[in-house]
């Protein structure tokens, strides 16, 4: 999943919005956000998992302490995508279409972009329903777009994506239409 990340750097560099790799990385890993931004991150992650587990039931996968190991790994297993989606795509679409339409377009692009991993045997996505995944993409896009709008930064979005992906190894549940729709609302 590094194509959105790489595209972000190329786009920002080409448009003179960053001078070099160091400035780009500084922009991405700016962790100085107000406490309410991080409260919002935790709130969205808790809502996502509480609803998913409550509606669908769950099994424990990896032990909870593994999050310490899993979370940094998720930076390369999903979180890095946010640099393209929330740092470039969402804000640019918002300039033309406004928040809601931009979020819907971003979620559709994000959903389609993930299609190939549904055909790779052994991935977590190989056993998922692709259309439910699309609803989940819309749900998460709204959460991530809101976090981006509130924080005006991409790091809280990266953290949210890492937490969602990382916790999926610990709290294992099957998505259902009901849980995806309720979470969306």
Model features per residue range: what roles?
Residues 51, 89, 140-144:
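Hydrophobic/aromatic residues in alpha-helical transmembrane segments
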Residues 80-107, 149-153:
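Membrane-interface helix/loop boundary segments of multi-pass membrane proteins
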Residues 42, 46, 74-79, 107, ...:
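Residue-level hotspots within the lipid-embedded alpha helices of multi-pass solute transporters
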């Amino acid at each position: 999943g590094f194509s959105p990340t790489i595209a972000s750097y190329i786009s920002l560099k080409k448009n003179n919005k960053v001078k070099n790799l160091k400035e780009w990385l500084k922009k991405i890993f700016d962790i100085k956000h107000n406490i309410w931004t991080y409260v919002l991150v935790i709130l969205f992650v808790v809502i996502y998992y509480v609803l998913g587990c409550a509606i669908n039931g769950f099994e424990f996968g990896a032990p909870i302490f593994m999050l310490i190991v899993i979370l940094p790994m998720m930076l390369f297993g999903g979180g890095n995508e946010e640099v393209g989606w929330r740092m470039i795509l969402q804000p640019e679409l918002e300039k033309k279409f406004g928040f809601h339409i931009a979020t819907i377009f971003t979620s559709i692009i994000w959903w389609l972009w993930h299609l190939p991993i549904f055909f790779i045997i052994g991935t977590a996505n190989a056993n998922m329903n692709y259309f439910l995944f699309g609803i989940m993409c819309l749900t998460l896009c709204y959460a991530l777009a809101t976090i981006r709008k509130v924080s005006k930064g991409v790091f809280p979005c990266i953290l949210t994506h890492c937490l969602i992906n990382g916790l999926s190894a610990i709290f294992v549940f099957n998505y259902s239409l009901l849980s995806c729709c309720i979470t969306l609302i």
